[in-house]
Amino acid sequence: NHYKKDIAFRSGLAITRQINTSFNFARNKVWGLDGNQVRTETQTRDFFPKGIMGNKGLPMAGWSIRFTGVEKWPLVKKIARSASIEHGFNGKETRAWQNRSLQTSKYTSSFSPLLGISMSSKKGTTISSRYALVTTVDNRFGGINSTRVRTDNTWTASTNYSHRGGFNI
């Protein structure tokens, strides 16, 4: 027999007409007995990891924030018809037990994007750039304990141009 319990909360808030936020928190628990009568349990929840092993953090909702109206800023208004800045965070903690003994724990911290910019120029060009930072801490227990940390830095950029109208031959 296996059992599952899920809970999730989502919300958003328009702080001003130009600043919009969203928040989400989820928790999942699965437990039961396998064919050999070994009790297994896995828990996953939104989490802000801290410390070398990630476990010094605290449960925390993920968030996103978007600033629109950036095209009105002095340096930007000369070139942009519209512009926005965005930022987001999502963190996870996943822990697994066997017969009530912790076997693994994994912590992920994802700033995606840490900073993102989107802009449409007055000449028909759209530009988008995003920088993301993702750190994963993977802990193994029982026998030989180990901790593996991986950090990925990603920068993406794209541009598009469109022209409307006809042409003469």
Predicted regions and their residues:
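Exposed, low-structure sequence patches enriched in small/polar residues
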Residues: 1-169
